[in-house]
Amino acid sequence: MTIRVFMVDDHALVRAGMRMILSGETDIEVVGEAESGEAALPLIRKLRPDVVLCDLHLPGVSGLEVTERVVRGKHARVIVVSVLEDGPMPRKLIEAGASGYVGKGGDSTELLRAVRDVARGKRYLAAGIAQKLALSGLDGSQSPFDELSPRELEIAMLLVQGLRQEDIARKLSLSPKTVNTHKSRLFAKLGIEDNIALARLASQYGLLDPALVL
């Protein structure tokens, strides 16, 4: 049985690299790709792939939101491919329904194993990520962002990137009032009062790629 894969990444070179790796396998077929969450979601609904490889940091709708929507609609299983291997994001993506999480620094063997395992209904975490998740539970170390819901965490990410509440509401198809409620709750949970404090905390705990923090 051929595993049908759809790729979502805003970098054409990354998509080309993954396509080259996947296309060399007789049991895997790349059925489509997109450079944004907005473009990907209707194509995923139409093409019905078995596995979606999704970047975390996408323009507009984030990888977290893509994961939630794809899983909620039962359109495919999702593997998140990200440069972030530390901080709360791997755990949050798994909580949001992702079936796998691999780092962009991994090799082709790891990517292929992730695709095959997830297509068979298993969960796959890159070894380094799985170890960090296990150790974070064993040594009692916690990030304040662990207390946030997946939606609150996504809104925190967008706030750190400099988006206004109105922009976030439009991107996530939420009302401005709902976004404001989530913002108030996440600020209270984190013990902060403004976006500057949020950006500092996010950078400290690995919530975002430091290059994205204003």
Which role does the model predict for each range below?
Residues S36-A39, S62-E65, E85:
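Acidic catalytic/metal-coordinating carboxylates
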Residues P88-E95, S99-A156, I196, Q204-P210:
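Short, flexible helix-to-coil linker/hinge segments that flank and couple to helix-turn-helix
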Residues P42, L64-H75:
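Short amphipathic alpha-helix used as the core "switch/output" element in two-component signaling
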Residues V14, P59, D86:
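The feature encodes the CheY-like receiver
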Residues E33-V51:
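Acidic, metal-coordinating helix/loop segments flanking the phosphotransfer/catalytic sites
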Residues D50, L56-H57:
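The short loop immediately C-terminal to the conserved phospho-acceptor aspartate in CheY-like receiver
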Residues R164-A197:
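Recognition helix of helix-turn-helix DNA-binding domains
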Residues D55, S82:
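Active-site residues of response regulator receiver
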